[in-house]
Amino acid sequence: MSAIDGLPPLRDVIKRHDLAARKSLGQNFLLDLNLTARIARAAGPLDDVTVVEIGPGPGGLTRALLATGARRVIAIERDERALGALEEIAAHYPGRLEIVCADAMEFDPRPLLGGARARIVANLPYNIATPLLIGWLCAEPWPPWYDMMVLMFQREVAQRIVACEDDDAYGRLAVLSNWRCDTGMLFDIAPSAFVPQPKVTSSVVRLVPRSAPEPCNRAALEQVAAAAFGQRRKMLRQSLKALGVDPARLAAAAGIDPTRRAETVPVSGFVAMANELIDIRDTKNTP
């Protein structure tokens, strides 16, 4: 991409700005600009789109997003060492890159969007990837402030996001992700593409918010999933006792056989049980 955007190779940028990746920040820099371009294309078309990027580091994906045509990129970077490299990209793309030095776990980008929707595209720092995703999936109101997420995770986490019932990776994260979004695994990236090399393969995932998920109380859904998968090898009539209601009654009222295990219940089944949980609690609280 250096030949396309006229900016120096990423290895030179890292050396010049003393940007050795820090394990404490979950940093693994993706230096293959062909792969960053592939991620940007997977999030496209980006014309007239505002992209929110988390943890841009030396800016490989940032450059790809801008070169692919993103109207505006809001890059949220906690590591002050990376700001100089990002400012060079901003100078190359005047008015299109906004750099925010902040912790993505604490920063809310919505005030910068002026009421418009954005697209989240990021090689997420490994140590905060799952909490960030859960926060975005729990956004209120719904549909959320973003129209798509294209994100890189450790492959094991990516599998937990896109899993369906009867998959080994199916669990609480899959229930929440697939209740609110259409999810899909796009492609893998080998450890050799990163500096430093992680010990595991990474995967790029796309999540597109559903405009109208099945009606459900999110907190109740999370409670049911947590109870069921907290003892995933046990039958629902046992694992759901943690909810403080008759587990067999709860499952049966939702049309689910209480002898089933959590890993065999589809997302729609968890939604039904969450709705029944609300009804049972409301009935108990009615004088």
UniProtKB/Swiss-Prot annotation:
Keywords: Cytoplasm, Methyltransferase, RNA-binding, rRNA processing, S-adenosyl-L-methionine, Transferase
EC number: 2.1.1.182
PROSITE patterns cross-referenced by the UniProt entry: RRNA_A_DIMETH, SAM_RNA_A_N6_MT
Record's catalysed reaction(s): adenosine(1518)/adenosine(1519) in 16S rRNA + 4 S-adenosyl-L-methionine = N(6)-dimethyladenosine(1518)/N(6)-dimethyladenosine(1519) in 16S rRNA + 4 S-adenosyl-L-homocysteine + 4 H(+)
SMART domains: rADc (SM00650)
GO terms, molecular function: 16S rRNA (adenine(1518)-N(6)/adenine(1519)-N(6))-dimethyltransferase activity; RNA binding
Subcellular location: Cytoplasm
Subcellular location, principal: cytoplasm
Any Pfam family: RrnaAD
Family annotation (PANTHER family): DIMETHYLADENOSINE TRANSFERASE, DIMETHYLADENOSINE TRANSFERASE-RELATED
Family: Belongs to the class I-like SAM-binding methyltransferase superfamily. rRNA adenine N(6)-methyltransferase family. RsmA subfamily.
Record-given protein name: Ribosomal RNA small subunit methyltransferase A
Annotated gene: rsmA
